[in-house]
């Protein structure tokens, strides 16, 4: 499965696409929430040009 690499609060993070719950666009950035485990929800964002195609496909599916 694909992963998304991003920085959040100065920390490099990586999350598996399968853990992503919600995806939305903010300007040229793709923002998302994901399951961190233990009942916690994490947030992240990646530029549109750096986003993996699977994340962009999730965004298109949610628009419909």
From Swiss-Prot:
<dbReference type="GO" id="GO:0004521">
    <property type="term" value="F:RNA endonuclease activity"/>
</dbReference>
<keyword id="KW-0488">Methylation</keyword>
<feature type="modified residue" description="N6-methyllysine; partial">
    <location>
        <position position="7"/>
    </location>
</feature>
<dbReference type="InterPro" id="IPR003212">
    <property type="entry name" value="DNA-bd_7a-e_arc"/>
</dbReference>
<keyword id="KW-0540">Nuclease</keyword>
<keyword id="KW-0013">ADP-ribosylation</keyword>
<comment type="similarity">
    <text>Belongs to the 7 kDa DNA-binding/endoribonuclease P2 family.</text>
</comment>
<dbReference type="GO" id="GO:0003677">
    <property type="term" value="F:DNA binding"/>
</dbReference>
<comment type="function">
    <text>Can constrain negative DNA supercoils. May be involved in maintaining the integrity of the genome at high temperature. Has RNA endonuclease activity with a narrow substrate specificity; the cleavage products are 3'-phosphooligonucleotides.</text>
</comment>
<keyword id="KW-0378">Hydrolase</keyword>
<keyword id="KW-0255">Endonuclease</keyword>
<keyword id="KW-0238">DNA-binding</keyword>
<dbReference type="Pfam" id="PF02294">
    <property type="entry name" value="7kD_DNA_binding"/>
</dbReference>
<protein>
    <recommendedName>
        <fullName>DNA-binding protein 7a</fullName>
        <ecNumber>3.1.27.-</ecNumber>
    </recommendedName>
</protein>
<feature type="modified residue" description="N6-methyllysine; partial">
    <location>
        <position position="5"/>
    </location>
</feature>
<dbReference type="InterPro" id="IPR016197">
    <property type="entry name" value="Chromo-like_dom_sf"/>
</dbReference>
<comment type="subunit">
    <text>Homodimer.</text>
</comment>
